[in-house]
C-alpha cells in the first residue's frame, strides 16, 4: 500500500503530474493494482452516509469489485456528475495516462456545495462522524482485497 499526497491540482495537476512521471517510482507504479484519489470527502453524499461516488465508473470495473468486498455497508456509487467529466479533471488522470487504474472518490453533493472553490470552504462543513466511518470501512475493505478477488481493469472506452 502506498500513500501519496500532492498539490497543485487547480493549477493544472502540477503535483500529481510530477509524481506520476518520477522515474524513480516506476517500480512502484508497475506493481500498483489501483489508485484511490480521495477528493472532497468531508460531507454526506447525495447517496447518504457511508457512501461515496467514483468518477469515471463507466471506464472500469473498480467500483463493482470494491463493492463486492465492501465492509459494513460502505457503498461506491456511480458518478452523478459524469457530464462534468470529473474523471479527466482531477489528479487521478495523471495516473490514468500511465494506464494505472485510478479513480477519484468523493462525497460532495454538487447541488448543495456552496463552498466548492470558495472562501467559505471551512472546517465547519466537515461531517467528522461520516468521514471517520468512510475511512474506517474503506480500510477494512482494503484488508479483504487480494489478487484473487481484486484485479480491476479498464474497458475500451477510457481515453489514455
Predicted regions and their residues:
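Metal-dependent peptidase/peptidase-like ectodomains
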Residues: 7-109
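His/Asp/Glu-rich mid-to-C-terminal helical/loop segments that flank catalytic regions of hydrolases
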Residues: 1, 107, 112-160
Amino acid at each position: 500500500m502506498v500513500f501519496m499526497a500532492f498539490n497543485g491540482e487547480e493549477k493544472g495537476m502540477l503535483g500529481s503530474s510530477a509524481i506520476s512521471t518520477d522515474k524513480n517510482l516506476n517500480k512502484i507504479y508497475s506493481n500498483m493494482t489501483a489508485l484511490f484519489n480521495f477528493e472532497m470527502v468531508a460531507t454526506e453524499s447525495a447517496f447518504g452516509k457511508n457512501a461515496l461516488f467514483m468518477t469515471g465508473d463507466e471506464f472500469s470495473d473498480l467500483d463493482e469489485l470494491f463493492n463486492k468486498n465492501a465492509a459494513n455497508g460502505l457503498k461506491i456509487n456511480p458518478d452523478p456528475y459524469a457530464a462534468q467529466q470529473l474523471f479527466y479533471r482531477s489528479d487521478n488522470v495523471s495516473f490514468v495516462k500511465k494506464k494505472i487504474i485510478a479513480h477519484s472518490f468523493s462525497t460532495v453533493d454538487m447541488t448543495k456545495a456552496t463552498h466548492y472553490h470558495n472562501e467559505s470552504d471551512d472546517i465547519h462543513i466537515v461531517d467528522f462522524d461520516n468521514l471517520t466511518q468512510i475511512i474506517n470501512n474503506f480500510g477494512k475493505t482494503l484488508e479483504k482485497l487480494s489478487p484473487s478477488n481484486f484485479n480491476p481493469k479498464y474497458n475500451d472506452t477510457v481515453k489514455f
